[in-house]
Amino acid sequence: MTESTARSIPLQIVQGDSPSAAPLQAGVKQLGGDKINRSPVQFADAPVLRKPSWIRVRIPSGNAVQNLKAKLRENRLVTVCEEASCPNIHECFGHGTATFMILGEVCTRRCSFCDVAHGRPKPPDANEPASLGQTVADMGLKYVVVTSVDRDDLRDGGAQHFVDCISAIREKSPGTRIEVLTPDFRGKGRMERALEILAQNPPDVFNHNIETVPDLYRNVRPGADYQWSLNLLKNFKAQHPEVPTKSGIMLGLGEEFEQIKATMRDLRAHDVDMITIGQYLQPTAHHHPVLKYWTPEDYKALEDYGYELGFSHVASGPMVRSSYHADVQAKGAGVS
């Protein structure tokens, strides 16, 4: 495989403020610079790479986006599409699909790539599962992705709320297939507790994103652990061999080609069935800079390599995201 010819830049890391520099108020969102300033690492000014021609987002016409947003607000629901500033939001909303984000809009982590707000979350909304179940039924969705912020403040990491949402959706829409995109449930005894709870009503697809190569974890996913995430995927699969597992990688954060391939091998070695690979795009000037734009040829080479490794489905392309066309990905893994 050949290395991308797209220009790349070096990354300069500077020491961040202490995460405990100021008390957090429950439910108050910290965004952009306020969030990243609490991270263990920050990024010195770096030249901005011009987006190449293959990074383009289509904005559809019509009222589909506004109609879906209105329905979500009516039911007090949140989508990760909006909260994380996903570049595919117009296409997905235009097709009437969305990835629902449960457990609030405030995350206990401070990942440098993510545009979701950081802070001290409020308690879970006990009415959210019922609202979600009704909304999915009203929209007639056949495939639903449910994700969440990290909830390190909860003893089970939010696993019971996931199960409550799965149960509510299946009660109203028994034919709907459900994919969950979970946090890592990191903490003493938390993974075991979460997996035990998820066994009450497992999803149709279990997704947890590895996000990046292990050497970049400190800069990209402070508070997370590469091996822990691999173990979560493997342990879930061991308990539910019939449920496809899935993970995703972002490119453009400073990784090398061989590091990407090594991470793909690690995922297969931990019994992951499906993989998504896409280009990282910087949400704001405060976030981790884009250090490289990988070419479509690179993504095709990684797709081919993924199938060589034995993944049942590989979605690899500049605009691919974990939940993008998730129903199509699931069909490739035998979910119908």
From Swiss-Prot:
UniProt similarity note: Belongs to the radical SAM superfamily. Lipoyl synthase family.
Keyword hit for Protein biosynthesis: no
Pathway membership, UniProt: Protein modification; protein lipoylation via endogenous pathway; protein N(6)-(lipoyl)lysine from octanoyl-[acyl-carrier-protein]: step 2/2
Binding site for [4Fe-4S] cluster 2: 107, 111, 114
Compartment list: Cytoplasm
InterPro entries: Aldolase_TIM, Elp3/MiaA/NifB-like_rSAM, LIAS_N, Lipoyl_synth, rSAM
Protein name: Lipoyl synthase
PROSITE patterns: RADICAL_SAM (PS51918)
Reported cofactor(s): [4Fe-4S] cluster
GO terms assigned for molecular function: 4 iron, 4 sulfur cluster binding; lipoate synthase activity; metal ion binding
Sites where the protein binds [4Fe-4S] cluster 1: 81, 86, 92, 323
Enzyme Commission designation: 2.8.1.8
Reactions the enzyme catalyzes: [[Fe-S] cluster scaffold protein carrying a second [4Fe-4S](2+) cluster] + N(6)-octanoyl-L-lysyl-[protein] + 2 oxidized [2Fe-2S]-[ferredoxin] + 2 S-adenosyl-L-methionine + 4 H(+) = [[Fe-S] cluster scaffold protein] + N(6)-[(R)-dihydrolipoyl]-L-lysyl-[protein] + 4 Fe(3+) + 2 hydrogen sulfide + 2 5'-deoxyadenosine + 2 L-methionine + 2 reduced [2Fe-2S]-[ferredoxin]
Key words, A-Z: 4Fe-4S, Cytoplasm, Iron, Iron-sulfur, Metal-binding, S-adenosyl-L-methionine, Transferase
Cofactor note: Binds 2 [4Fe-4S] clusters per subunit. One cluster is coordinated with 3 cysteines and an exchangeable S-adenosyl-L-methionine.
GO CC annotation: cytoplasm
Source species of the chain: Stenotrophomonas maltophilia (strain R551-3)
Radical SAM core domain segment(s): 93-312
SMART domains reported in the protein's UniProt record: Elp3
